[in-house]
UniProtKB/Swiss-Prot annotation:
Source organism: Plasmopara viticola
Keyword Transmembrane helix: no
Record has Secreted as a keyword: yes
Gene behind the chain: RXLR3
This protein's name: Secreted RxLR effector protein 3
Function recorded in the entry: Secreted effector that completely suppresses the host cell death induced by cell death-inducing proteins.
């Protein structure tokens, strides 16, 4: 190499070093921010290998909305099941009587006792009625407005 080329490269390196130090001193480049970025990059590479990736956590309000929608869908399916079971194992007089019981304000226990006494209601159906339709107003709403699939 020629001496002029070596001097040219050395001069360019000196100017680059002077420019960086001037920029750091004047505050154009924040040294602590630069170091933080470097540490974050190196730390993230060490903590997350390729075979083990972390997933982003869904915000809780999204989970709650999904849970509520799932509960509502299941409740509607169970309401439909109860209605179909009651129609299968009963006559129209018994369903009218249950509607009258609901309108008169009797409790859910009275309705369940009536269903067990006058219709073929299995223990499983009784648990469904007790668990999901405890209030007589809700049971009355299900019986008054059946939904068929």
């Amino acid at each position: 190499m020629r001496a002029s080329t070596i001097l040219f490269v050395l001069g360019a390196a000196i100017l680059a070093v002077i420019g960086v130090t001037t920029a750091l001193d004047s505050g154009e480049i924040d040294k602590s921010t630069q170091e933080n970025h470097r540490l974050l990059r190196s730390g993230s590479m060490e903590q997350e290998p390729d075979e083990e990736r972390k997933f982003i956590k869904v915000p809780s309000f999204m989970n709650k909305a999904a849970r509520e929608a799932k509960k509502a869908k299941k409740k509607a399916e169970i309401a439909n099941l109860v209605w179909l079971k009651l129609q299968k194992y009963s006559d129209s007089y018994a369903l009218n009587y249950v509607d009258d019981m609901v309108k008169s304000g009797r409790s859910a226990d009275d309705e369940i006792k009536f269903l067990k006494k006058h219709m073929k209601v299995s223990n499983n159906l009784q648990r469904v009625i007790e668990g999901h339709f405890r209030s007589h107003a809700e049971l009355g709403r299900v019986l008054a407005k059946p939904k068929y699939k």
